[in-house]
Amino acid sequence: MSQLSLFSAEARPAALTDLAGLLCGPGQIVRFGAGDQARLSIVLADATRAPAVRSACAEAGVGAQAVVTESGTTALRTAFRCDLAELARAWTRGAVKMVPQEWQLDGPTLRLWALTAGAPDGRGGYLLGLDPHAPQTHQALVAATTRVGLPPARIGDALRISGTRRVARLVELVGPPPARLPAGAWPRYRGRAAC
């Protein structure tokens, strides 16, 4: 039996702050009115992930609705909510998405990032997608993944986690694959998914 990491996704119950994982990838958060409400949205590259992402949002206490965009892709969005305003304040400067200073990545947040924007690279590594429309977040996310023990290589609009120890650490942090996730999409270590 392996020891549970204090930073893994299974170390604590889901929390609203875990939704920052959507913002590590292509997610967006916008404030409304006086800034006391915010809406979180994300366009998914893979529509089959929508049920798993909706379930993860619900575990964090936030409902998300699936919609089809004008371009035909699937997006998830929340209602405007007061409890998302603090996340919006932390992750934006004006209308620009920014990673909070000294922000610490953890397992639950990394799990949502992998769920929404992660993919195996076909060579034993794993890619964590970045927001191509927010290049100002990329270097801070490189630093955050490095601080959590996953120093990545930047490959275009993604961070590549590779190497036996790093992939094992990633598998440890994200925990087992969500029930509704398509097969083969979750990080694996030597052919084994997290268990």
How would you describe each model-predicted region?
Residues M1-C195:
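Internal intein/HINT superfamily modules and their associated LAGLIDADG
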